[in-house]
């Protein structure tokens, strides 16, 4: 998923996945702390405009991603903005109902930058979402409303990143 750039210097990456469930069920899995913690990383999410979202990428709190919810439109859309390497980074989540009991979940990271210094980092986000969205689809297909634990497994691979992620 290439980085999109506009003339003003705004950049974005996005990823999406089709998952089973109603918009309300999918919203519960992406826009609540207990829901997102089942398939992403341990998280707290205060569901309201002005609320706080915290995603814990390390158990000791050293890699917490803290953001303020600036848009809250359940069960369709929310935006959280936080400080990132290049400055403010906005992450927009949307849920779109489709036929056949499916919904499309889309996440878009947007940031402003005057150089491409952070482009590789954010390009990596889009690849990471591919793997996490596979987990979301598995969770909603086979384990909805069940509790789980998130963990990370690091394994060296001689394959290109995209090939290794596809095999996960």
Task: Provide a role label for each language-model segment.
Residues 115-162, 166:
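A conserved amphipathic terminal alpha-helix motif
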Residues 71, 79-127:
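Beta-strand/loop substructures that line and gate deep hydrophobic ligand-binding cavities in soluble
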Residues 26:
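Glycine/alanine-rich phosphate-binding loops at beta-alpha junctions
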Residues 8, 14, 21, 33-68, ...:
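Short beta-edge strand/loop motif at the mouth of beta-sheet-based domains
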Residues 1-6:
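A detector for short, charged/polar N-terminal pre-domain segments
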